[in-house]
Amino acid sequence: MDAKTSIKNRLPSRHVTEGPERAPHRSYLYAMGLTTQQIHQPFVGVASCWNEAAPCNIALMRQAQAVKKGVASAGGTPREFCTITVTDGIAMGHDGMRSSLPSRECIADSVELTVRGHSYDALVGIAGCDKSLPGMMMAMVRLNVPSIFIYGGSILPGNFRGQQVTVQDMFEAVGKHSVGEMSDADLDEIERVACPSAGACGAQFTANTMATVSEAIGLALPYSAGAPAPYEIRDAFCTTAGEKVMELIAANIRPRDIVTRLALENAAAVVAASGGSTNAALHLPAIAHECGIKFDLFDVAEIFKKTPYIADLKPGGRYVAKDMFEVGGIPLLMKTLFDNGFLHGDCLTVTGRTIAENLKSVKWNPHQDVVRPADKPITVTGGVVGLKGNLAPEGAIVKVAGMSNLKFTGPARCFDREEDAFEAVQKRTYKEGEVIVIRYEGPRGGPGMREMLATTAALTGQGMGGKIALITDGRFSGATRGFCIGHVGPEAAIGGPIGLLRDGDIIEIDAVIGTLNVKLTDAELAERKSQWTPRETNHASGALWKYAQQVGPAVAGAVTHPGGAHEKQCYADI
């Protein structure tokens, strides 16, 4: 028995492969063509979110094969499986979006159940769309077996009449079309060229934001999260990940050794520096929750406030993920942040080395303008800002990257679901200067905390992005531009102040000092609360009903179970 098999006595897979009582289990493994040697090697789960719903995940199965080759070459036995994913680009703007955030929990739960049920010793997780990235990382830290995360890669930009375009331009084209600024023929032409390859949305939307997080938090190999999906180098990263996870097993380096409070602060810093998605303020607390670490929206916002915004990435800037990869990738961004004191260098990573050690060989690239030096930023504070006030006692979040005006005051225009707000935008029945309020769209009230990209993109397409504001207890896509505030808590469904608003109430937003208030006294709000009654949803059964019963507030990540702080034994220690 060699060194690879001799460690079996401390690994979970011993429960299904070792001893005479496991002869029935081994017979199943022989049925799949495994050799005796392979059965007694460490079992590595290779999980992907492959499906044919959208280009985001279509390349994942190919990459999984490369991971398996790496695992096998390093003396492990790869065991491939798939889990679900809900692609936001397809779910956006209709009832299907209610499934998006709950799918994050389903992904984490299904990966956990598969690994537990089959006693796998390690995990390489491959994800390609918004909720699958945090869902996979949540599973890794929950299980706490040696793990490496792999992003499936971003899509290449499209080309519309010589202009680089992304799916963001498609959603905004709908707004232009609604006001006669784009013809049917033009709309048809751009929709055929906007998304030319496999991969997730190419700008710094939620998928690329969480991909950036995966490197900064230490769960992904350096440079691996930046390469676009069609690039052949992705297979090399995947093969290396398969090899490296075997080293993690041997060294017994686990996700909770990597994902510490300081690593979470690093993750929040790269979100702010890259002008990333507000959804990170939901996903980072959820990942922390799996580790038993308290790290809520306010903790995230504190890091955002003191981190400079330095990456000129869409939607607030000019470039896409491919451009940043080609000038130095995420390590270039991290290098200048580290050199200027914005990252903790002593955090461990899946390389077995620290952040500082990984960045030691990274040289600054002066021949590019995608990433600025951290001491010469686009703005001195991050591209995402946390807010709090009498309208959001549990906080709210706004993406300010690319915005020039960070204050807004106006009368409320209230809608109790996104469809009604979108119809008002399409018909232009709103007024310039108003604050559009979309409520009962929170985690419990939606249920599912939908994103409002269809509405915000239509407003931008109509040229109103800087002339109105929008607040919601739901979420916004990473592709959203304009003064759009999400995650307002407490949500309307549980009687939060956003549910007490009436048309005409004056709302004051100040993203400079971080406040969100309505010009009502505490007594007026209390009087309205006494008259408020809960609303029923149309979901009285099924997965969304179950989610609504379990989900917690957005400020803590909208999680559905007690978390690592309450567990008595993590899976890796069975």
Residues covered by each model-derived region:
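A short, small-residue-rich loop immediately preceding and capping a beta-strand
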Residues: T114-M136, I148-Y151
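Glycine-rich, N-terminal phosphate-binding loop and its surrounding beta-alpha-beta segment
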Residues: V71, S110-T114
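Catalytic or ion-coupling anion/metal-binding cores of large enzyme and transporter domains
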Residues: D2-E52, C56-I58, Q63-C82, G89-I90, ...
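Glycine-rich, highly charged phosphate/nucleotide-binding loops
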Residues: S100-D109
